[in-house]
């Protein structure tokens, strides 16, 4: 393979004029330079000359790649148009010198100011296609950009989605060249497949039409026969319905006349009884007012007592608070006394320290003055000073210089050790002061507070236990009273229910009692008697009660018996005993069918038989009384089922509204109560009610105070629970704080003993060793000075040591020590001032606490006096309360007697009114039934008219005179004037008015209708059959053509898919096989010899069948890290992973050179070293690396350097190169 040996840039971006760059024989070249110098422009130049588009070169349009100079100010006198023009050239080019074997190929790309670009190879202009073919032959893929990595591309690769990564593999593998053809063929297949499927569906549909039309021709004749049969059956059904409606109406008319006479007689009796009752009520109201007034007085007195008791408890709360406040203040005073004593000790200690330091300062100042007085004694004249200087130079020459230097080094070391020793002494002093002045004091306070909290907690627990015992006793008393009250209320509720039943339905109760006595008697004599219908069934839900009673109707009080023989024997027995009448339902002879609902299940309606509970043995009887009736939630639902859904059965709403089978709508009737008692039982119930009310009232009054006290105790327990929980939390927190305080004291002691003190000892030892060494050197220095300055010292009269000791160095040392003493005095004064201020503050707090204690004691005394006064008032009120209770008891006894007398009169009147209402309801029911039968007759006749049913008429008025649109009185009159001839109705239908006859006719009509519905005649069946046969031939030919074309295109598609998949998988398999090894090498510790050291990396295809249409997941696991997705890796880890992928892809179709622009930007030093080491290992004559980098860890490993810098005067980037192969690593 070839290599890139050099570049030549002319006016390209920041490079003005012609700039040449040579890479020589280097296989690892680094381009370096400061930011903004033009390094990345070099990358753009390489990309530009190799055909990369401008949008990848950080420029929107090509002309922006031409160098642009800086124009001078237009107002300048030196402005030169020609110079300005030359600084902005009109074109630019880049040449790349590519070594291919022994031949050097010159690649050139030119760009003009108007945006035109051209390409040359060895000076010959070629097209872009030829230019790119030449590069592709050298494995330089322009579209895949396998030869370069732009700045920022590494981060983009690491952040790529699986689909984007798959797209990159397509470009590298070359499978993308088949993408367009693949998608076009796939689209054609989908269209052809859709068309063929649609055509097959049409063919099947037309074939079905042929069969349908053929069958329709055969059904037309059968349809005509069945239609005639249906008309005859509908005629019989209409005659049967009209005949029985007329019979039922005649029976009801006779019964209505008898009821009207009985109602008139009962009304007279009621008027006489009401006048007598009014007189009794007036007397009763007056006595009731007296009792109410007495109860009100008793309530007011009781409320006054409750208020005083509440006030007494309210006094207890501030009493307890005042007691706690006094105890708290006393403990605070004790604590403040300790603080005062301790702070006075601190003040005395710092005053003593201040005196000691001040005396030391005064003594040192006197010493300085004495040294100043001796200064003139050791002063040299000018000649002696010259002599001293000459001798001093001789001294330095003969070894004094070395000694002075050693002594200076020792002094410096000594000063550093002293400073460090002073720091450790300060740390020890700080820790000791922290322990004595803060932590110990805080610990004492925390310990005291903890003991106080424990005492408070024990007191609260004791009080909580006492309150719980009291609360349990109160709750036990209240529960016992509540149970008694519940029992009494339950009895009262039962009594009231029974009273309501008896008072509202007195007549009906007597009838029901008589009926039940008869049934009980029949059960004794005839074992086959089962019981009353309403006793043997009941609604599943309470809301169905009214609807079920409406449906049962006259069968509500019917008697279910085992067979017809038992029923006949029972009827004969009742006649013989003159015991009244009853209806019987024999289980063996009644004919029923299982009711079914020809509608989807819904919560809006339900079959009546499904709404009741009963024993399985009575199922036949329940089917008989319920029939196929339906219970609906609302009237609108019932109307919808009747007239829109065509339901023929009876429809009843839960409010009692009824729609008959014939379409007649009537109101519902209320269900009767279950328990009915006679008049004597009613009187005993009223007496029991009054007695229960008095007992409940007495029990409630007795428990009122207990309930109030229980609530107060319960609130107190709740508050105590909260206080105990808070105190326990505080105790825990206080323990934790105390443990932390002790732990901190231990920490500071351990710090002093184990760390600071050993270090101080060590430093002192070092200081002693330095002093000994210094003394030896000083002695050696003095010996040398005495030898050299011997004659001179004899002349001046004092030694050189004495002279030097009284020089400027001594004065500076004394000044420094004096400053240290002054600083120490200032520190002690500040501490003394702080402690003095703190002592004053504590003293003020102590005085305030004393005053607070006096105020709390005064408040406590006042509260005790208030408590005594309230207790006296409570005693007085309790006596008054007892007196009023006794008076109320006497009044209530008299009231009960009067109430019993009044109840007796009301019961008599209520019985009469109840009987009257029963008669009126019965009369209204008969009227409604007559109207119902009239409406059903009108409806039946209308149905005949609408359905064209010809029934025989013997009157002049016919059904043609009946209006269809309305059902008013006129329509009923017309209906009643129509006489129908029933001779054509068979005898069995005249005698049978049961559901079996109706269902038999309906079943026959339904069977015929089903046959007619199945036949569905089609008059044009033959004509349409011929038409469909022609269309089937056309669509069949079209379908076969589409299937053949689909097969042809599918074969072409599979070939293209195979080529595309093979190219893609070949690239993927290669990269996947080499990726892990490359990543392991990039992440391996350079010092590790383990073969499998480093991280792991892998690629996974999401779709094995069409990998190019799905994504590729890239997973990289750095060394010693657990597995996680790429997005959760750090920036450096992502960069290394991306580089491993790039290197693996490059190794598949290796380009002759690989240019990397600042790929190490996000890497730390270790990873940069690994990348550099990888490049050095893999560089070779067939693989040249050119790296743009700012990090010396990278470029110091390269074979050659290309330096880029900015020439500010020319406003241009410049190049310098350096071959590193001549230098040792």
Swiss-Prot record:
Q: Which residues form the SMC hinge domain?
A: 527-641
Give any GO molecular function from the UniProt entry: ATP hydrolysis activity
Q: Where in the cell is it found?
A: Nucleus; Chromosome
Q: Does the keyword Nucleotide-binding apply?
A: yes
Q: What is the effect of changing residue 458 to D?
A: In temperature-sensitive mutant SMC1-1
Q: One GO BP annotation here?
A: establishment of meiotic sister chromatid cohesion
What start-end ranges are recorded for coiled-coil regions in this protein? 173-489, 679-1063
Q: Which residues bind ATP?
A: 33-40
Identify the GO cellular component terms for this protein. Answer: cohesin complex; meiotic cohesin complex; mitotic cohesin complex; nucleus
- Keywords attached to this entry: ATP-binding, Cell cycle, Cell division, Chromosome, Coiled coil, Mitosis, Nucleotide-binding, Nucleus
Give yes or no: UniProt keyword Coiled coil: yes
Chain location of the short sequence motif Nuclear localization signal per the record = 1057-1061
List, alphabetically, the SMART domains matched: SMC_hinge (SM00968)
Principal localisation: nucleus
**Gene3D superfamilies linked:** 1.10.287.1490, 1.20.1060.20, 3.30.70.1620, P-loop containing nucleotide triphosphate hydrolases
Which family is this sequence assigned to?
A: Belongs to the SMC family. SMC1 subfamily.
Q: What is known of its domains?
A: The flexible SMC hinge domain, which separates the large intramolecular coiled coil regions, allows the heterotypic interaction with the corresponding domain of SMC3, forming a V-shaped heterodimer. The two heads of the heterodimer are then connected by different ends of the cleavable MCD1 protein, forming a ring structure.
**Other remarks on this protein:** Present with 5710 molecules/cell in log phase SD medium.
Describe the subunit structure.
Cohesin complexes are composed of the SMC1 and SMC3 heterodimer attached via their SMC hinge domain, MCD1/SCC1 which link them, and IRR1/SCC3, which interacts with MCD1. The cohesin complex also interacts with SCC2, which is required for its association with chromosomes.
- Explain the purpose of this protein: Involved in chromosome cohesion during cell cycle and in DNA repair. Central component of cohesin complex. The cohesin complex is required for the cohesion of sister chromatids after DNA replication. The cohesin complex apparently forms a large proteinaceous ring within which sister chromatids can be trapped. At anaphase, the complex is cleaved and dissociates from chromatin, allowing sister chromatids to segregate.
Q: What is this protein called?
A: Structural maintenance of chromosomes protein 1
Source species, please?
Answer: Saccharomyces cerevisiae (strain ATCC 204508 / S288c) (Baker's yeast)
Provide the gene name from the record. SMC1
């Amino acid at each position: 393979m070839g290599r890139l040996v050099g570049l030549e840039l002319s006016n390209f971006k920041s490079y003005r004029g012609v700039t040449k760059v040579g890479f020589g024989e280097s296989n690892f070249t680094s381009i370096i330079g400061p930011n903004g110098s033009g390094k990345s422009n070099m990358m753009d130049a390489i990309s530009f000359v190799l055909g990369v588009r401008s949008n990848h070169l950080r420029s929107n349009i090509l002309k922006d790649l031409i160098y642009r100079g800086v124009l001078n100010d237009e107002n300048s006198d030196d402005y030169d148009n020609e110079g300005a023009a030359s600084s902005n050239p009109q074109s630019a080019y880049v040449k790349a010198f590519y070594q291919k074997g022994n031949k050097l190929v010159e690649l050139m790309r030119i760009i003009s100011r108007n945006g035109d670009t051209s390409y040359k190879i060895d000076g010959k202009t070629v097209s872009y296609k030829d230019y790119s073919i030449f590069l592709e032959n050298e494995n330089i893929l322009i579209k895949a950009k396998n030869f370069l990595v732009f700045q920022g591309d590494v981060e983009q690769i690491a952040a790529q989605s699986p689909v984007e990564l798959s797209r990159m593999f397509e470009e590298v593998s070359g499978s993308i060249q088949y993408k367009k053809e693949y998608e076009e063929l796939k689209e054609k297949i989908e269209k052809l497949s859709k068309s063929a499927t649609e055509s097959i569906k049409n063919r099947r549909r037309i074939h079905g039409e042929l069969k349908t039309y053929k069958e329709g021709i055969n059904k037309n004749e059968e349809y005509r026969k069945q239609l005639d049969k249906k008309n005859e059956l509908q005629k019989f059904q209409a005659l049967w319905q009209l005949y029985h409606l007329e019979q039922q109406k005649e029976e009801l008319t006779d019964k209505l006349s008898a009821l009207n006479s009985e109602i008139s007689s009962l009304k007279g009796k009621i008027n006489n009884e009401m006048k007598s009752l009014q007189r009794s009520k007036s007397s009763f109201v007056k006595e009731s007012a007296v009792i109410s007034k007495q109860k009100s007085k008793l309530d007011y007195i009781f409320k006054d007592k409750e208020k005083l008791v509440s006030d007494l408890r309210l006094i207890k709360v501030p009493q307890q608070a005042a007691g706690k406040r006094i105890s708290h203040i006393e403990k605070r005073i004790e604590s403040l006394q300790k603080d005062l004593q301790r702070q006075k000790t601190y003040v005395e200690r710092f005053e003593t320290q201040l005196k000691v330091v001040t005396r030391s300062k005064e003594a040192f100042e006197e010493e300085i003055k004495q040294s100043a007085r001796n200064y003139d004694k050791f002063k040299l004249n000018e000649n002696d000073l010259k002599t001293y200087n000459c001798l001093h130079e001789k001294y330095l020459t003969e070894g004094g210089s070395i000694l002075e230097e050693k002594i200076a080094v020792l002094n410096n070391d000594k000063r550093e050790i002293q400073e460090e020793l002073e720091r450790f002494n300060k740390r020890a002093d700080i820790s000791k002061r922290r322990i004595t002045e803060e932590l110990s004091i805080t610990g004492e306070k925390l310990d005291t507070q903890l003991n106080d909290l424990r005492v408070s907690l024990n007191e609260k627990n004791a009080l909580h236990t006492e309150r719980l015992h009291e609360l349990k006793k109160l709750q036990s008393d209240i529960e016992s009273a509540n149970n008694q009250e519940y029992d009494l209320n339950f009895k009262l509720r039962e009594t009231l229910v029974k009273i309501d039943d008896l008072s509202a339905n007195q007549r009906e109760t007597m009838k029901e009692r008589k009926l039940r006595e008869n049934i009980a008697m029949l059960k004794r004599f005839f074992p086959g008697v089962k019981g009353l219908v309403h006793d043997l069934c009941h609604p599943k839900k309470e809301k169905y009660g009214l609807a079920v009673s409406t449906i049962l109707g006259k069968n509500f009080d019917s008697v279910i018996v085992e067979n017809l023989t038992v029923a006949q024997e029972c009827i004969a027995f009742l006649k013989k005993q003159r015991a009244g009448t009853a209806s019987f339902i024999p289980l063996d002879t009644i004919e029923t069918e299982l009711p079914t609902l020809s509608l989807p299940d819904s919560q809006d309606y339900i079959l009546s038989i499904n709404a009741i509970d009963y024993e399985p043995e009575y199922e036949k009887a329940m089917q008989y009384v319920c029939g196929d009736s339906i219970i609906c939630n609302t009237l609108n639902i019932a109307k919808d089922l009747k007239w829109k859904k065509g339901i023929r059965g009876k429809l009843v709403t839960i409010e009692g509204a009824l729609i008959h089978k014939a379409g007649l709508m009537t109101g519902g009737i209320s269900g009767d109560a279950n328990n009915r008692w006679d008049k004597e039982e009613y009187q005993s119930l009223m007496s029991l009610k009054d007695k229960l009310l008095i007992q409940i009232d007495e029990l409630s009054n007795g428990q009122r105070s207990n309930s109030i006290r229980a609530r107060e105790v319960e609130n107190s327990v709740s508050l105590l629970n909260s206080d105990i929980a808070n105190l326990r939390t505080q105790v825990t927190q206080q323990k934790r704080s105390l443990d932390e305080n002790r732990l901190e004291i231990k920490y500071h002691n351990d710090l002093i003993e184990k760390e600071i003190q050993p270090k101080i000892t060590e430093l002192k030892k070092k200081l002693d060793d330095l002093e000994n060494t210094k003394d030896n050197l000083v002695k050696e220095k003095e010996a040398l000075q005495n030898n050299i300055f011997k004659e001179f010292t004899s002349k001046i009269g004092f030694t050189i040591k004495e002279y030097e000791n009284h020089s400027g160095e001594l004065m500076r040392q004394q000044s420094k020590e004096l400053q240290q003493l002054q600083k120490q005095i200032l520190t002690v004064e500040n501490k003394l001032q702080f402690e003095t201020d703190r002592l004053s503050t504590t003293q003020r707090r102590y005085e305030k606490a004393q005053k607070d204690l006096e105020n709390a004691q005064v408040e406590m005394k006042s509260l005790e006096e208030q408590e005594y006064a309230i207790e006296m008032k409570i005693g007085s009120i309790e006596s008054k309360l007892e007196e009023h209770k006794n008076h109320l008891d006497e009044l209530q006894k008299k009231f009960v007697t009067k109430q019993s007398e009044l109840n007796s009169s009301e019961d008599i009147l209520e019985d009469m009114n109840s009987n009257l209402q029963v008669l009126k309801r019965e009369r209204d029911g008969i009227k409604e039934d007559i109207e119902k039968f009239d409406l059903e007759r009108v409806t039946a006749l209308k149905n005949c008219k609408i359905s064209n049913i010809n029934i025989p008429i013997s009157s002049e008025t016919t059904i043609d005179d009946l209006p269809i649109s309305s059902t008013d009185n006129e329509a009923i009159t017309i209906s009643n004037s129509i006489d129908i001839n029933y001779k054509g109705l068979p005898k069995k239908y005249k005698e049978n008015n049961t559901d079996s006859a109706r269902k038999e006719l309906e079943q026959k009509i339904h069977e015929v209708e089903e046959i007619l519905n199945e036949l569905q005649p089609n008059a044009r069946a033959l004509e349409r059959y011929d038409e469909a046969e022609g269309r089937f031939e056309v669509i069949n030919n079209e379908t076969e053509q589409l299937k053949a074309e689909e097969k042809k295109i599918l074969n072409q598609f599979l070939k293209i898919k195979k080529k595309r998949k093979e190219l893609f998988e070949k690239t993927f398999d290669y990269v996947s096989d080499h990726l892990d090894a490359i990543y392991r090498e990039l992440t391996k510790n350079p010092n590790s010899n383990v073969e499998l050291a480093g991280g792991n990396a892998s690629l996974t295809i999401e779709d094995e069948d069409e990998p190019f249409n799905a994504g590729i997941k890239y997973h990289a696991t750095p060394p010693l890290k657990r597995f996680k997705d790429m997005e959760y890796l750090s920036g450096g880890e992502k960069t290394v992973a991306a580089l491993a992928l790039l290197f693996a892809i490059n190794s598949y179709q290796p380009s002759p050179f690989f240019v990397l622009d600042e790929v190490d930007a996000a890497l730390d030093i270790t990873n940069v070293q690994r990348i550099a080491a990888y490049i050095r290992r893999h560089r070779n004559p067939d693989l040249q690396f050119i790296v743009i980098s700012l990090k010396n860890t990278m470029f110091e490993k390269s074979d050659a350097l290309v330096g880029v810098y900015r020439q500010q005067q020319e406003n241009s980037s410049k190049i310098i190169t350096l071959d590193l192969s001549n230098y040792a690593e």
